[in-house]
């Protein structure tokens, strides 16, 4: 009996031991898997992403990300970890066509907008998201209203990462591209990646040619009013025309007619560094300054009388003027000259709260009130790229963001209100291969605002075609006497991007002319005040209360000292 029970007990004990061993082997795997799922950094919405992030490339070697840009964007894998995005087939036409941008956790979302009446290509075929592949041949012409892309768009198989040939000439008005042609077999490499084709045609026909340079990460090409963009690192410009943030109640001040322009462009200079990865950021900057001795509270200048151009951001350490970050979004692009770390943005050589910029001797401090947090002020110029292009067909566009307040982008036009558009607050390098009326000569009067002197290049005819392919817009003053010079027209009025990439309406608070002598004596309002109410750029980079002067409730007009 005993001998007959022993094997049975042993057998039972053996089974129990085996069960324990199996549980010991299986449970840790299950727990590890569940813990790994819970703590998967790829699912962290606050994760800082980069183009070569394994979360984007994929861990299994199959299709890693499916580009869902709005309509018929898709992912076509020709090999392991092939990120095939015929990016931004969400290029529906009109005033809110979206182009793809990075969005933490999901790879990208829509945030840029194309303006004008059709024919915009913020994505589509020729969106080359691998370092391999020169796209040659005709990539399918678009005509008619449907704008479906057909034909052979050329297989991408080289290593140059350039696009040659006519990259999708558009002659229709709808121009949505399904991006269904063309095979991609390259790996995602950030050094020569092209997410969204930097050609944008809004209005007139004409082919656009894209020649991205090496290192031009995430190019987009939303431009305005029938302008064909040619340049691998072109920017997208969203504006609120007629929004009027002012630094003081001075009629016809440099800020009395300027729009708010934010930057969602891709250009990252060769000297640009990012802490923790390339997490894109859009920033709204407000300028503060005294205008020089005896002009406190007036529009700032370069140390002379009021009404002159304010200093660029490069001169923030000089006696007059300074810039402050007043809003922004972590759902859009990082601009040149900036770094991102710990949820904050920093300029190259940023200030800390131990050494902040506090205005200048004899000039008022910044209007933000108490001591600032790190990353709130800029010491270098995040607007003008530090690297240019020697190619005659591709110049980087250097608009990073609009220094609002006194100075910056100003209204200009041909004399009619409808044709007014902003001049540039800093130098802009723009290439146009075929455009309609993207540039307008300025009349130069105080009612029209200032205009810009041309740099290299010229404007010919009514089509505003650029003979040399390059125009550099200089800083605008408050009352320019030089007429006939180009200004960039921005006819649309949505602000750039909400959390879901949808355009935000312009708040009615800023649409009227402001100043003590304006009709109805409408007070000028600070963009900081508008941002705290409307939040047009998504999540703010800092507490809105910090950006308001002490003791002043939200919603009240701001007077800047």
UniProtKB/Swiss-Prot annotation:
The main place the protein resides is secreted
Q: Does the keyword Phosphoprotein apply?
A: no
**What functional role does this protein have?**
Important for the epidermal barrier integrity.
Annotated protein name in UniProt: Corneodesmosin
Per the UniProt entry, the signal peptide is 1-32
Q: Which GO terms describe its cellular component?
A: cornified envelope; desmosome; extracellular region
The record's subcellular location field reads:
Secreted
Biased composition range(s): Polar residues: 415-430
Which organism is the protein's source? Mus musculus
The entry's keywords: Secreted, Signal
